Design a protein with these regions (language model features):
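Catalytic PLP-binding core of fold-type I/II PLP enzymes
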Residues: 1-17
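PLP-dependent enzyme catalytic core of the Aspartate aminotransferase-like
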Residues: 146-155, 161-218
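Conserved glycine-rich beta-strand-loop-beta hairpin in the small C-terminal domain of fold type I
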Residues: 83, 99-109, 119-132, 166-168
Length: 218
């Protein structure tokens, strides 16, 4: 009697082509939620939707009632933005986005990991969660405040995401670059090397350098 609610907002930004929704294994019991803000690079432009099977029609009707009594409709500017986003085939856009994010994410991973920083290789999206191995700070929030003060790099503490505050985890976004300019200069499937990243995402490289120096100094 279990119903699965699967948040797949980042599914289009998976770096490998083997992503498979859980709905393909249990379609009659799965509700998929997704939207355009992540794949479209439109943070703050919130337009999402549910994919609900006919077998869960009763839940669909309840969601419709709840939505209509809560927010009625998406704001007009976001609706027009969504028309633009979905009116044409966006596969080339997605492929370029994934290519860029994979290259930049791997650069951050390869250059930040050390015996002072634990970090997993990126599998999709545009975030990493490094753990800084030090006992200088009482909380991840205190650590992030010090990183911002010492390096100018802004990170969110792991405690903001439910991790214990005494674990020195921080969420890092590697998107401080002009995505449209980057995309305009590459081809689908192009190999993105260091020189290309340095040309279009110099702030990311600078930020990683500052974080690495900081981690080695504490």
């Amino acid at each position: 009697n279990l119903i699965i609610l699967s948040d797949e907002i980042y599914s289009d930004l998976s770096f490998e082509d083997n992503y498979k929704s859980i709905s393909s294994f249990c379609p009659e019991k799965t509700i998929v939620s997704t939207g355009l803000s992540k794949w479209c690079g439109a943070g703050g432009w919130r337009l999402g939707y549910f994919i609900i099977p006919d077998s869960l029609k009763e839940i669909k009707n309840m969601i419709n009632v709840l939505a209509s009594e809560t927010f009625s409709a998406v704001s007009a500017p976001i609706q027009y933005a969504a028309i633009k986003a979905y009116e044409n085939d966006y596969s080339d856009y997605i492929n370029k986005s994934r290519n860029i994010l994979k290259a930049v994410g791997n650069y951050v991973y390869e250059n930040l990991r050390s015996n002072k920083v634990l970090i997993n290789s990126p599998q999709g999206g545009f975030y990493l969660m490094p753990e800084f191995l030090n006992k200088k700070f009482n909380s991840s929030s205190q650590m992030c405040d010090n990183i911002l003060k010492d390096t100018g790099v802004a990170l969110l503490p792991g405690s903001d995401f439910g991790f214990e505050k005494n674990r020195m985890l921080a969420r890092l976004s590697f998107t401080d670059f002009d995505g449209q300019k980057f995309m305009d200069q590459i081809k689908v499937g192009q190999i993105i090397d260091y020189n290309t990243i340095n040309e279009f995402a110099p702030k990311v490289i600078e930020g990683v350098d500052e974080l690495k120096k900081w981690s080695e100094s504490i």
